[in-house]
């Protein structure tokens, strides 16, 4: 795959990056270099290699999935400038 100047301009527009017309050939060249590096990955033999989710073996500790209220209502509401009946109180906005 090769990137020409019009494609480079389109990518720049989609990325909301202002690129001067004089800089488009260099940008297209950089895109082509990047794509060349990516195409090298197709040459790697990955037959027999297991998919990985991480480069280090990790096992996540599991805990029981228990529904709880968190028992934090008083602490959370202590930060509120105004709380009533266990809820945040805010000024009325709509009449």
Curated annotation (Swiss-Prot):
Family under the similarity heading: Belongs to the GatC family.
Protein source organism: Roseobacter denitrificans (strain ATCC 33942 / OCh 114)
GO MF, one example: asparaginyl-tRNA synthase (glutamine-hydrolyzing) activity
Assigned keywords, A-Z: ATP-binding, Ligase, Nucleotide-binding, Protein biosynthesis
One annotated GO biological process: regulation of translational fidelity
Reactions it catalyzes: L-glutamyl-tRNA(Gln) + L-glutamine + ATP + H2O = L-glutaminyl-tRNA(Gln) + L-glutamate + ADP + phosphate + H(+); L-aspartyl-tRNA(Asn) + L-glutamine + ATP + H2O = L-asparaginyl-tRNA(Asn) + L-glutamate + ADP + phosphate + 2 H(+)
Subunit structure, as described in the record: Heterotrimer of A, B and C subunits.
Function: Allows the formation of correctly charged Asn-tRNA(Asn) or Gln-tRNA(Gln) through the transamidation of misacylated Asp-tRNA(Asn) or Glu-tRNA(Gln) in organisms which lack either or both of asparaginyl-tRNA or glutaminyl-tRNA synthetases. The reaction takes place in the presence of glutamine and ATP through an activated phospho-Asp-tRNA(Asn) or phospho-Glu-tRNA(Gln).
Domain of life from the UniProt record: Bacteria
Name of the protein this chain belongs to: Aspartyl/glutamyl-tRNA(Asn/Gln) amidotransferase subunit C
Xref: InterPro entries: Asp/Glu-ADT_sf_sub_c, GatC
E.C. number: 6.3.5.-
UniProt xrefs under Pfam families: GatC
UniProt gene name: gatC
